[in-house]
Amino acid sequence: MFVRIVKMSFHSKHIKEFQEMFEEKKQFIRNSYGCKLLELYQDKTNPEVFFTYSYWENDHDLEKYRNSELFKSVWAKTKTFFNDKPQAWSVDKKISLK
């Protein structure tokens, strides 16, 4: 299992619309095959910056999601809200303490 982190920065005027869209689509994204967890974070000092953390069983499952109609439609709309280029990382968790 690995974590996909995506950093997105939005024009202020689009933040509410992005959050509404995420609220509407989050369960569909989370229910994608291989997705084990989905989280959305907002930067505390710059409210235009958001991060998604999604936990995936394997690379194949993430790629299958990224090629799905769900992803294509959500990403096409999300891209219109950006004020900067998004960044994404696939990372392996090394240590987790509770």
Residue ranges and their predicted role:
Residues M1-R4, I15, K26, E39-Y41, ...:
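Short acidic/polar alpha-helix capping motifs at helix-coil junctions
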Residues F2-R4, G34, L38, N67, ...:
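Anionic, Ser/Thr-rich low-complexity intrinsically disordered regions
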Residues F2-S9, E39-R66:
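Short, well-ordered beta-strand segments in beta-rich or mixed alpha/beta enzyme
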Residues F10-S12, N58, D92-I95:
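Non-catalytic surface loops within mature trypsin-like serine protease
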Residues S12, Y65-S68, K85:
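Residues at alpha-helix boundaries and the short loops/turns that link adjacent helices
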Residues H14-L37, L70-W75:
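Short amphipathic alpha-helical segments
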Residues R30, E57, N83:
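Short conserved AdoMet
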